[in-house]
Swiss-Prot record:
Disruption phenotype: No visible phenotype. Mg(2+) binds at G70, E85, E88, E89. The gene is mutT3. Residues 30-164 form the Nudix hydrolase domain. Its cofactor is Mg(2+); Mn(2+). This is Putative 8-oxo-dGTP diphosphatase 3.
Length: 217
């Protein structure tokens, strides 16, 4: 009895592996671009932590800290790439992640009319998840967001970090308000502006963006 042909996604799995060379001669990994997962989760005090990957020394830009991620395959969206790579490199389950936004943080014109992009997929987890590093990771670490810039970052991540980091915002909510269950979390208040929103008491003075934040919960 003939065997069934492999699913399309299995046939093309890995077809994104390869380099795109820019007009200036710099090589970028991913024939169809690349994507990485910027995952936040609340620390015990409610402030955000970011999951960072300490890249193995043998890898490209080894020894630096960045996001789990990699080459995008031809059949994938950036979100699918980032979630897949976070599973492969950090052992994360897609069911534990909530994607909040995608941001193209790098664009390059390559030779022969090729084009390369890096997409940062912003997501939240409800808690500091356990991780399982693969051989591409010397270490995986939850880092307090205000300490990320203190590490030796991957140059691409370092260049985009300022536009990806959050500002704190407290949302006044009654104790019985069911929206409390959705906090803390990341909210993109407008393109390139992210807030880390935590619940506050109903009698707290609302922030200037309070009404808009509430409408997005």
């Amino acid at each position: 009895m003939p065997s069934c042909p492999p699913a399309y996604s299995e046939q093309v799995r890995g077809d994104g592996d390869g380099w795109v060379v820019s007009d200036s001669g710099v090589a970028y990994w991913g024939r169809y671009g690349a994507a990485g997962l910027l995952l936040r989760a609340p620390r015990p005090d409610g402030t955000p932590a970011v999951l960072l990957q300490h890249r193995a020394l043998w890898s490209h830009q080894g020894g630096t800290w960045g996001l789990p991620g990699g080459a995008r395959d031809s059949h994938e969206t950036p979100e699918q790439t980032a979630v897949r790579e976070s599973s492969e490199e950090a052992g994360l389950s897609a069911e534990r992640l909530e994607v909040r936004a995608t941001v193209v943080t790098a664009e390059v014109c390559g030779v022969d009319d090729t084009h390369w992009t890096y997409t940062t997929v912003v997501a939240d987890a409800g808690e500091l998840l356990d991780t399982v590093p693969n051989r591409e990771s010397a270490e995986l670490r939850w880092v307090a967001e205000n300490e990320v810039a203190d590490l030796p970052l991957h140059p691409g991540f370092a260049a985009s970090w300022q536009r990806l980091r959050t500002a704190p915002a407290t949302v006044p909510l009654a104790r019985c308000d069911e929206r409390r269950q959705r906090l803390p979390r990341t909210i993109q208040i407008e393109a390139g502006v992210f807030l880390w929103c935590t619940p506050g008491d109903a009698d707290q003075a609302p922030s200037p963006l309070g009404r808009r934040i509430s409408s997005l919960l």
